[in-house]
Amino acid sequence: TLNDYELRQLDVKTAYLNGPLEEEIYMVAPPGVGAPYWRLRKGLYGLRQAGRQWYLTLHETYSSLKYTCCESDWSIYTCNIGDDVTISATSVDDILLVTNSKTASDIATDELRKKFTITDGGDAQWLLGCRISRWRNNRILKIDQEFFLVRILREFGMEFCNSTVTPCPKWRLMTDMCPKSDDDRRTVASLPYCAIVGKCMYLSTCTRPDISYAVRELARFMSNYGQQHFDAAKHLLRYLQRTRSRGLVYSRIPNTFPMFRTFADSDWAMSEGRRSVSGYIIECAGAPIAWSSKQQGIVALSSCEAEYLACAHCTRQIVWTRSLFREMGFNQANPTTLFCDNKGTVSCTHDPHSHSQMKHIDIWAHYICDCVNKRSIDVHHIPGVDNPADLLTKPLAKVIHSKWLTRLRLYAGQGGVSSAEVA
């Protein structure tokens, strides 16, 4: 979106059959064939080695074509020859080519077609269940999962349900709601709780940061859920029914803007076990590209400590993201700004030694101070009402939740940046 690059989708037919096997493996021959047993020379779907051998074959192919594997993500390869820039991202047999020109895209496709049997999908419109919509004249790209979401609603009989405006119910999910007896467990055993949570988890990972907190709460009870937990899962589906056309909208940003904007936040001891919830958001091209809602591993003794741990959690993702973008050719000369709404935390990241209330924190959390000193990141204060990571730390009221949907550019319809639909 930032550079108006070409997006092209390729599919490798019977990908696993391309990988030669290193182990000696035999199979029973089909009936009617003379030899009773066959030795496998290449992989088959279902073999434990098949996926690994396919990756090694693909890696050798890219290496022979002068591509470089990104150490930050081994599924991404880059190739810069002359003025042509090619980035290839692979998930099993799906390949997404990102190039700076159609000529470079055609060259990369032809080179891969000489090695494998490939279906050329043209301009990328679908990838791993995500719909990609582009308005190239306006430098706008939208990613959504509306069709996948509709299938989820149909599967669980919620396609025409009454909708809700927030993903979380009014009640908090507690262990007291878990079944107390074998009869209670048998009553809820047939409920599709795990299936709902698993499918919603994929949504929250790909395109829907607004449901990350709700999914995380539901996932805590996957092995021991009760009726109220299931009601909360259906509440989430009712919210998704209302917002099913929403997706992340990216657009070109002014050159004066930094490539990344990051936000970290935390509640404080609001959960049942008094462990706080960390949330972070990393934005690029105006919308989130990475986010997380995660319960902290220890009980924070103050809100400052809880926010400090949240910032440390975010810092690790920032460092990885900067490294990945650098390997893809988008180097960041300036430190990435991390916004936090706790002034004490901001002060601690710049001078941790002068704060006695932080001396007991485990050493891993002080990694953020090292990154500040190395100028990889720079932590700044932001008012809590302007911190979108708040969405990932606790249930919010309708008005505040809707505000963050707009702020994160989770838009409905055709993805018009200027006219956002607010639930």
Predicted regions and their residues:
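RNase H-like nuclease fold core
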Residues: 200, 262-304
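Reverse-transcriptase-like RNA-dependent polymerase core
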Residues: 13-38, 56, 80-81, 160-177, ...
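Structured nucleic-acid-interacting core domains from mobile-element enzymes and related host factors
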Residues: 1-5, 238-264, 330
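C-terminal reverse transcriptase regions that engage the nucleic-acid substrate
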Residues: 121-248, 383, 391-393
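RNase H-like nuclease module associated with reverse transcription
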Residues: 131, 221, 258-259, 294-423
